[in-house]
Amino acid sequence: MRVHYLWLLLILGHVASARYSSANDWTVDHPQTLFAWEGACIRIPCKYKTPLPKARLDNILLFQNYEFDKATKKFTGTVLYNATKTEKDPESELYLSKQGRVTFLGNRIDNCTLKIHPIRANDSGNLGLRMTAGTERWMEPIHLNVSEKPFQPYIQMPSEIRESQSVTLTCGLNFSCFGYDILLKWFLEDSEITSITSSVTSITSSVTSSIKNVYTESKLTFQPKWTDHGKSVKCQVQHSSKVLSERTVRLDVKYTPKLEIKVNPTEVEKNNSVTMTCRVNSSNPKLRTVAVSWFKDGRPLEDQELEQEQQMSKLILHSVTKDMRGKYRCQASNDIGPGESEEVELTVHYAPEPSRVHIYPSPAEEGQSVELICESLASPSATNYTWYHNRKPIPGDTQEKLRIPKVSPWHAGNYSCLAENRLGHGKIDQEAKLDVHYAPKAVTTVIQSFTPILEGDSVTLVCRYNSSNPDVTSYRWNPQGSGSVLKPGVLRIQKVTWDSMPVSCAACNHKCSWALPVILNVHYAPRDVKVLKVSPASEIRAGQRVLLQCDFAESNPAEVRFFWKKNGSLVQEGRYLSFGSVSPEDSGNYNCMVNNSIGETLSQAWNLQVLYAPRRLRVSISPGDHVMEGKKATLSCESDANPPISQYTWFDSSGQDLHSSGQKLRLEPLEVQHTGSYRCKGTNGIGTGESPPSTLTVYYSPETIGKRVALGLGFCLTICILAIWGMKIQKKWKQNRSQQGLQENSSGQSFFVRNKKARRTPLSEGPQSQGCYNPAMDDTVSYAILRFPESDTHNTGDAGTPATQAPPPNNSDSVTYSVIQKRPMGDYENVNPSCPEDESIHYSELVQFGAGKRPQAKEDVDYVTLKH
């Protein structure tokens, strides 16, 4: 309990000390005095800082004519504004912005700016701004100066204003309030200055509203003239185009003395007198003493008669000479500096002085424009001039300048002039020489060689000219490097070519003049001989008409003859070579030859290519037309065609397409079946040609022959064995025959039929086929069964109906017929048999045992042929 009491005492002591020190810790900044007038507004810029860094305003009051009540220890007075933080939004930064005429523009942190609108005259005096932040409180006095009428602006001027020096005037008003705008305008002698002119440099306006000052300013920067001295400058305050107040000041412009000079008379004849006066018209500050200085052509005058009077000075010139002509001015000084008068020119009249001539340009180039000027001092100026060329008058030219538009060599010479005015004429002082430069004249190139000039000869040329100013210093030749220079102006050309270009020379001083080109006229044999095809326009085909022309580019002399050669042999003479119907045999290399009296020239060979369809086709067989089977054979289709054959087609002896499009047909490996005739067909862009047939014979190899011989021997051995067995069977048959004769009622019979088969005649050899017929290819075994009809008792229905036909009781009631045809031995397809064909054996057997009636049935015959 005691500890808590000690802590409470410490907290109360801290609060008390904070209250006691709060008066020293508040900081409030605002303008010391604010100015306004009845009906305007006042904006009070204000910044504050509470004793506690994070403290915020809880309450703000604005009192008018406030007092402190010592009894209640509170401030009393008219409350113009009272705002307290709201319970709904205690953290808000702004209070209620406006109460009556007062608007709070600050916040709860550091801004206490206020605005009173409209302001009243009775608002003058002190306002009290009461601010509370927690336990901290503060009363800040604010002084207002409100007048019933708008007060005048102030104008700040520099201490001294000088003419032509830039100065700045400042018009200010200790007033600025947003929502009540004012304008500051400048006037010079009641004329508003609205824009930048030659004398007005700038007009700037600014508004300042800070915690230190509140004012509106306008600055006028200009360069005053001396005539602006004493003029009024006015600054006017306006609101909504209404003049509120104004202030006027007078300009005190300091300037140098302003002088006026007069000459009487300004034009005087030689030896007369002249009086000049200089008057001081104005000066600020004024001249202490009149001390006037005189100047002629910018130089001070000395030892002249002067008369000084108040504010005036006189200069008297006696017995005026021409040297006294010129420009005069006077000068006087004050504390600012010297002032000068304008210049006046004194003219002294006299007769022309001796003249001289100036030539422009000199020396002159031929063709240039030349101007000659006659220089003769005179006053008044000379009105008439007489020009002389080589001391002879030039009629028609009476001006000061003599102009020659295009000078030529004959214009060269000495020139002089004579000037004249109303006081008399002058004299000729000295002559001027006109020197006209021109390039060499009449330049020519001369050939100093024998003519005619032949190709390969040497030629000498000389460059000559008529006149030149200045003299010729060098020569040039065109084309450059065409020869060697023997000496200046002489050129030697070694081995002149047939196409030598024309040669010209130039003689040069500071300019070059070229001679006309001289043609060497070199004689030479015909050049660039060539063969031209006149017709046809496109490719040449057999049967067309062809016309060739012999052409050449150059020939000197021009008379020529033409000759034609084919493959080096002379064909005919003439410019044209014609083929009525060209053939392949006309193909070859053609040259045309052109000759003149100098020599002959042969053209390059021109190849005449005649296009024609394939011809002379034939089939060549490699390695030969008789080839053993198993090897390979290559058939080539040889032809004559232009252009070459692009597609080949091969056919066999039967005319069948072998589907080979190449020039060569390869057969590998060869078989006997490849034997036959072959032909080829070739096609190019012109047409198609076909070869006659060529025969290829393929014979058996020894291996094949051996195999077939062995097969034949085996077959013969088989026949012999069968023959032996046949004899045995025959013998057996003869034995059984006697027994069969005893059986009369027997219907069975057995017999052999021998049938000799005629051998097919071998085919004759031909180019398409070789060999003979081979019976072994037709080996057959024939077999037949003859069934006997059944007895009549069983023939109750259709014999062909399977339902009523009963099978025979046994297989003995049948007839068997067979043919055995033996395979021939040693028979080959392409070898004739060495012995006749063995005959075939036919065997049949008819057997029927038992007695009784035959069953009546439809006789059936089954016949079977077996081939192997």
Curated annotation (Swiss-Prot):
Effect upon mutating R279Q: In strain: BXSB
Cytoplasmic side stretches: 728-868
Effect caused by changing K242E: In strain: DBA/2J and BXSB
Highest taxon of source: Eukaryota
Annotated TM spans: 709-727
Any GO MF annotation of the entry: carbohydrate binding
Expression across tissues: B-lymphocytes.
Result after altering P488S: In strain: BXSB
Compartment annotation: Cell membrane
Family, per entry: Belongs to the immunoglobulin superfamily. SIGLEC (sialic acid binding Ig-like lectin) family.
Official protein name in the record: B-cell receptor CD22
